[in-house]
Swiss-Prot record:
Keywords: 4Fe-4S, ATP-binding, Bacteriochlorophyll biosynthesis, Chlorophyll biosynthesis, Iron, Iron-sulfur, Metal-binding, Nucleotide-binding, Oxidoreductase, Photosynthesis. This is Light-independent protochlorophyllide reductase subunit N. The lineage of its organism: Bacteria, Pseudomonadati, Pseudomonadota, Alphaproteobacteria, Rhodobacterales. It comes from Rhodobacter capsulatus (strain ATCC BAA-309 / NBRC 16581 / SB1003). Belongs to the BchN/ChlN family. Protochlorophyllide reductase is composed of three subunits; BchL, BchN and BchB. Forms a heterotetramer of two BchB and two BchN subunits. GO terms for biological process: light-independent bacteriochlorophyll biosynthetic process; photosynthesis, dark reaction. Changing F25A: Retains 50% activity. GO terms for molecular function: 4 iron, 4 sulfur cluster binding; ATP binding; metal ion binding; oxidoreductase activity, acting on iron-sulfur proteins as donors; oxidoreductase activity, acting on the CH-CH group of donors, iron-sulfur protein as acceptor.
Length: 424
């Protein structure tokens, strides 16, 4: 073994915890992918015009396109306490449901303004569910930047749904976390070929096929930012299958192997099902290794995808992890990925932006993964950057996306090489 070969395992490594200035989206942005996933749902943000502009810009749609989300704007009289916000909300919901009879699930989404005003959206959801049952179920959750960052909006949304799921004694598997439809289909196909089932998804594409949960339910996370949802499912009696997350060939194989072992799938069958897609994934990743191998990596906290992605880049792409920061580090959920990270990786939970920027300058990494607000200033200083938001909005899970995932990181390095007059 080469002396340069890294050792692996960060399970017991020290974690720097920072609670300073942050540069990250609020949880409202998760509506952008959730409204596309849940085809009979509508997300009504109770917030300000700033919330409305954020969602419209993030989703890349105009409001006249009739997307499945909107904002109940808190006006000046609401902020001044001169209007009954709950009556106004009831009126807006009634108008919405009359105009959109296809809605079966309505989510009241809390924002910074509604949190400051202490609007009781839980009580409002309960009241509105009673008014509009059985046609529509109304939920509430928070996407406020005071409470959530970026992907945590999905976590609070799914956690709000779990208590309302039907109870079952059936031995079913739930795959938890929103995936693009094409990726979900690939996931279900692999599990079906392994003989695992029945398999349900949370969130489901429609409310009439949402999962039930009970003491014989097993679940596995497809997304790493679902700590609150995990707790809600476990309180309903479901048991979590622990696994690395399905990024890259190795991560996908270990994820599927954890499910296969839980369901008693033979090694021969597992090999027969996974051999061909594993080979395709390895070949697709290999096309990017010349660009990625040996390059240093620094990740600012953004989406909670950082640790499993760093594992993928270190082990499958040969990158050198320096500092890997994440908004929140749920050690129980991340344990399988932490065990596979290079042991010399510096782990950070949370953010103190100025201090982290100073460390970044001292390290001077080859590739920096960061939010939109940091990317342009860092590019101007000569750093190659990858927008972290692309890793959430691009299909990156499972075998068939492994090459695309590697390409997301190799492209900025090739671009920087071209700008510097080198070979691409």
């Amino acid at each position: 073994m080469s002396l340069d070969s890294p050792t692996f395992g960060c399970t017991d490594s020290p974690v720097r915890r920072e609670r300073g200035q942050k540069a990250v989206f609020c949880g409202l942005t998760s509506i952008v992918w959730l409204h596309r996933k849940m085809q009979d749902a509508f997300f009504l943000v109770v917030g300000s015009r700033t919330c409305a502009h954020l969602l419209q810009a993030a989703a890349g749609v105009m409001i006249f396109a009739e997307p499945r989300f909107g904002t109940a704007v808190l006006e000046e009289q609401d902020l001044a306490g001169l209007a009954d916000a709950h009556k106004e909300l009831d009126r807006e919901v009634a108008k919405l449901l009359e105009r959109r009879p296809d809605i079966r699930q309505l989510f009241l989404v809390g924002s910074c303004p509604s949190e400051v005003l202490k609007l009781d959206l839980d009580r409002a959801a309960e009241r509105l569910s009673g008014l509009h049952a059985p046609h529509v179920r109304v939920y509430s959750y928070t996407g406020s930047g005071l409470d959530t960052t970026f992907t945590q909006g999905e976590d609070t949304c799914l956690a709000a749904m779990v208590p309302t799921l039907d109870t079952t004694e059936a031995a079913e598997l739930i795959v938890v976390g929103a995936l693009p439809d094409v990726v979900e289909d690939q996931c279900l196909s692999l599990l079906t070929q392994l003989g695992v089932g029945p398999v349900r998804m949370l969130p489901a594409r429609r409310s009439d096929i949402e999962p039930a949960v009970g003491p014989n339910t097993r679940f596995i996370l497809a997304q790493p930012f679902l700590g609150e949802t995990t707790g809600a499912l476990e309180r309903r009696g479901a048991k979590r299958i622990a696994a690395p997350f399905p990024f890259g060939e190795e991560g996908t194989t270990l994820w599927l192997k954890a499910v296969a072992d839980a369901y008693g799938v033979s090694a021969e069958k597992f090999e027969a099902v996974t051999a061909a897609p594993r080979a395709r994934a390895k070949k697709a990743i290999a096309a990017h290794l010349e660009t990625l191998t040996g390059k240093s990596l620094f990740m600012f906290p953004d989406s909670q995808l950082e640790i499993p992605l760093a594992r993928f880049l270190a082990r499958e792409c040969g990158m050198k992890t320096t500092e890997i920061a994440t908004p929140f580090l749920h050690k129980a959920i991340m344990a399988p990925d932490l065990a596979l990270l290079p042991s010399n990786t510096a782990l950070t939970e949370g953010q103190d932006l100025e201090a982290q920027l100073d460390r970044h300058e001292a390290i001077n990494p080859d590739l920096t993964v960061c939010g939109l607000g940091l990317a342009n200033p860092l590019e101007a200083k000569g750093h190659a950057t990858k927008w972290a938001i692309e890793l959430v909005f691009t299909p990156v899970h499972f075998y068939e996306q492994a090459g695309d995932l590697a390409g997301l990181f190799s492209r900025p390095l090739r671009r920087r090489a071209l700008l510097n007059g080198g070979a691409a």
